[in-house]
C-alpha cells in the first residue's frame, strides 16, 4: 500500500514547542538520549561528528549517548591490505568513526589520518590503521582494539564492529554473474540484483545490546550495497531494529552512486532495504530539501551521479513519515555532503518527538 507524504509545519514558528522538545529530549531516567548510528564509509562519521558535538555543547558526558556500529566488509586500499596480510578486520572505517568522535582541534585527528610516505610495506597506510592493527594483534579482539584506541584519543562515544567474523560481500548481478568482495561489486557495471554475506556471520553481542537499549537508531547515508546493507544483513540486526521501541530514522542519500545505484530514486533505496531485510524498519525518513548547487551537480553528473529524487508518493516507506530539512552542503564546490550539525539537530529532534506522536512541526536546521 502507498502512503502519502505528510508535510509538517515550522518548529521555530511555535515558541512553546522548543521548550517541549528540550523537556522530552531527556528520557525517563533523566539522561541524554542514546542514539545508535549504523553504516560505514564517509556517511557514518558525519552523523557521529554532529551528534558528538551537539552532546558536548549540551554538556552531556554519557559515553553511551553516541554509538557507531561500523561495517567490516571493506577489502580495498590500506584496510584490504592489512586485512589480507595480518588477518585482522578492516580498520579504516572504525578509524574514521573514532576520529569523528574527538574534539575537532585534537592533535590526534591529523596524526591518525597521516599516511606514511616512505618505508617498505607501510607507504600509504594511515597511522590510525596501523595502531588499530597493532592493538588488535595485542588484544586478540578487534572490538577491544577500537575501545582502547578510543580511550587513548578521548573519544566522546563508542564505535562497535557489527561482527567480529571475517565476512565478505557476495552480489548476484542483473547480468547473471556473481562477484565477491566490496571492490569487485563497485567495479562491475552490471546492477546488483541480490546481496549476501559469506559466511553468514553472528553479530557482536554488544552491538545487539546497543540497539536494544537505544532511544534512537539511525541508518546513515552512504553506499546502499556496500555500507548500508552489510550491517542489516547480519543475523538478528534487522529483526532487532524492527522489534525495539527506539525511534528509527533513515537518512536518505543526497546523490546516486556510480557502480551501485545509478538512477535510483528514494523509493528504490527503500525497496532494496525492504526486500533484503523483510521489514519496514523506519519511523521517519529524513530527506534533504536544499537545492544542490548547479556547478557541483554538473561535476557529479560527469561521473555518473545525480541527486536522489524523493517521489511525492513512496510505495516502499511503510508507515514512515517523511521529514524534509536543509541538510546538504557543498565543500569547495566539489563534494556534496550532509552537514553534520544540521543532520544531528534533525536526528535529535526526531528522537525527542518519539515514534507514536505524529509530527506537527518542521525541523528547521
Where are these regions (language model features)?
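C-terminal functional extensions of proteins
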Residues: 2-19, 263-365
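Conserved phosphate- and dinucleotide-binding cores of soluble alpha/beta proteins
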Residues: 5-31, 52-55, 62-89, 187-189, ...
